[in-house]
C-alpha cells in the first residue's frame, strides 16, 4: 500500500513524498496496521471526491477499543509530485476557523481552491466538540517538520531531549492521515472512516462490510487530552520502525512486563524503501490503551533488553513515568466545556514536546529535586531509597493490595535497645535456678520473682523479666545473681551483657583467683592436721580445669590446664592438673600465649583444695627444727554437695598425713577423724560419687575404700594385678567410676602401661584383665 505523507516545508507549503510502508513493526502494533479507507486529496488540477461521516451510519455490535488514535493520509493517483497550495474557504464553521488559525497546515488555502477541494463538515452545530464527534479517530503520528524558528525558542522547547533526530532549529509538528473506505457500495453520501483495528483486509477477500463499532462514535475531549506524545516518540534504538499493513492480524493482548519482550529486527531508517532515502524524523505510533488502562500502568517495550536483566527493569521505576501518569490522571479530570478545548491539538503537541525528556537522565534530576523539595513523588521510588530518606512510604513495585511501610528507627533508639546473648540467658537460667522456689513463678514467657528473701525496705517487689529488659534489672537482684556465679569466666560473661551490669559487679582483681569460689571453714578447737590444737581458719577453693584451644605455627592445638591468678598482678598461671610436680605453663619452653577473649575456652572439670596456715620449721640443726615460721599450706580435698532443704549442706573429705581420713560436715561445722588405715598406707586419691566418698591407697594393689557419711569405711575386693602399679587414680565417667592404674616395667623406667578397670573398657584391656585376674569395679 503506497501513500503520500504530507510534510511541512520551509515555506509552510505542503510537500508530498512517495513512500511505502514496509512490514517490519512488532506484533503488538499489528492490529493497527490493517488497511482502511482513504480519502483523496487533490490539488487545483484534479477533482476531489468527498463524503461525509454521519453518526447514524455506524455498525453496532462489534467491539472496538474505545480510544483508537487517528491519522490522516494523502493518496495520489499519479506518480508526479505536485506542490499543493492550501487555502481556506469562507463557509467553514467558526470553530473550525479558529482551528485553522492555530493549525493552518490542516486546511487547504488559496483562491483557486474550490469548495470541492475541501472536507465539508456539518455546520449546524459549530463547536469543536461536535466536529470531533463526527470524526472517527484512527491514528495519530508525530513528526519533525523543517520549520525555521528562532534558535532560542526551539532550544527552550526541545531542552533535555535525547531523541536521536536532528533537532537543530526545528519544532515538532504532526500530520493526520485519514483512511477513507475504498468500498463505495456501503458508503452513504460521504467518506466513512473506519478504525484500523476493526477493519478487514480488502485486497485479499474482496469488498467486505466495515465492522467498526458504534462505541467510538464520539471522541471524549477529556480522554483525548490525556494523550502524551512522549510515548509515541521512538528512541534511538527504535528509530525508523515501519508498519506492517498487508495482512489481517488478530487482536493481541498487551505484553506482560514480567515476560521477555519480542525482539524487533532493526531496519534501514528510511521512509521510502524503494528509493532508499533516509528520513530525518523517527515516526512511531502507540495504542492509547497502553496509556489509558484502568490501573494507569505504563507498559514499556524495549526489545533489546536481555532476559537476564528483566528483574533489573522491574526494579527501575523511572520518575518520569510516574510524573506522566500523574499528569494523565489530572488532565482526565478536566471539564468538557473548558475554554482550552479549542486548543486541543496544540496542547497535545505541547505536552508531547514537554514530555520528551531523556529517560536515562531525568531520574537523577527528579530524584534530587524530590529529595530537596520533599514532594509526594518520593513515594514512587524504590524501598531502599525510602529507607535511606527515612520516610514512611508505600512501595509502588509491590502487587495491588499489598502495602509496605518503612519506618526506620533512629540510631540512638537502636543503641538503647539491648539484645541478650546466649551467655546472658544461660547465666540468668543458672542464677534463677538457685533462688528459693517460693520466690519464682513462671507465667507464659515471663518470669515473676518475689524478692522477699532480700533485705529491702519494702516487703514485696515483683519484676517481670523479659529478654529485652536486661538493663532494667535492679541492683539488688544483680547482686543476688552474682552470688550464684562460681567461676571468674561466669563473672566475665555476666559483666559483658550490658553497661548497667558492669557497674554493679566490680572487675576481678588480684585478690580473687581465677575461677575460684571460696568458703570460710573453721577448724575444731583442739584438732589440727599436724596433731596440735589451733584456732586458725582454712579456706575451701574450687579450681576449675579448662580445655583451651590456641593457635600455633603448626596449626591449632589444645591444652588441658588449670588457671590461677598471681597475687602480685602478674599474668595468670596455667598449671597442668595431670602433673604431680605442678608444671607451670608460661615458663621456659612451656610458654603459651593466647587471647582469653578470642580463644575458645571450654570448662572441662574442677577439683577442690583447702588452704590454711601453720607453723613449720624453716631451718634444721643437728636434725632438729631450729627455726619455725608461718607457712601457707594447700591440700587437695574432695567436695560433696548434699541434698537438703536449704541446699547449703556439704561435706569435705581430706586425707591427712597421719594415714587417716578426716571429714568436715557443714551441718556440724566441725572436723571428724574417720578411721586410720589398717596397714598404715596413705591415701593416694579421693573422689565423690553418688552421695559417697571413694578413696584408693598408695599400696599400688588396687585397694579401694568406700566412706559413708556416717563415718563407716568399707573396702572393695582387690582388683590388683600381678605386679605393683606405680600410680592409681579414680575417675568418674558418666554414671560409672573407673580405676586407672599405671604400670612401669622393671628396668624400663620410661615404658609405662595404663589399665582402666570398669564396665566400658576396651576389648584388649578386658582380655588382659581376665588373663591377669583383674576384676571390674562399678
UniProtKB/Swiss-Prot annotation:
GO cellular component annotations of the record: nucleus
SUPFAM superfamilies reported in the protein's UniProt record: F-box domain
Record keywords: Nucleus, Ubl conjugation
Compartmental location: Nucleus
Biased composition (Low complexity): 230-247
Disruption phenotype: Reduced seed germination in red (R) light; this phenotype is reversed in plants lacking PIF1. Reduced PIF1 degradation in response to red light pulse. Hypersensitivity to gravity stimulus and increased greening. Increased hypocotyl growth independently of far-red (FR) pulse at light-off, as the result of a rapid loss of active phyB due to increased dark reversion. Suppression of cop1 phenotype in darkness. Highly unstable phyB-containing photobodies in plants lacking both PCH1 and PCHL.
Domain of life: Eukaryota
Compositional bias (Polar residues): 317-326
Ranges of compositional bias, category Basic and acidic residues: 198-212, 265-275
Pfam families per record: Beta-prop_KIB1-4 (PF03478), F-box (PF00646)
Main location, first listed in the record: nucleus
Subunit structure: Interacts with light-activated phyB. Binds directly to PIF1 and COP1.
Purpose of the protein: Together with PCHL, regulates growth and development adaptation to the ambient environment by controlling negatively phytochrome B (phyB) dark reversion, a temperature-dependent thermal relaxation process during which phyB reverts from the active to the inactive state. Contributes to red (R) light-triggered photomorphogenesis. Promotes various light responses such as seed germination, hypocotyl gravitropism and chlorophyll biosynthesis, via direct interaction with PIF1 and COP1. Prevents DNA-binding ability of PIF1 to negatively regulate the expressions of its target genes.
Protein known as: Protein PHOTOPERIODIC CONTROL OF HYPOCOTYL 1
Organism: Arabidopsis thaliana (Mouse-ear cress)
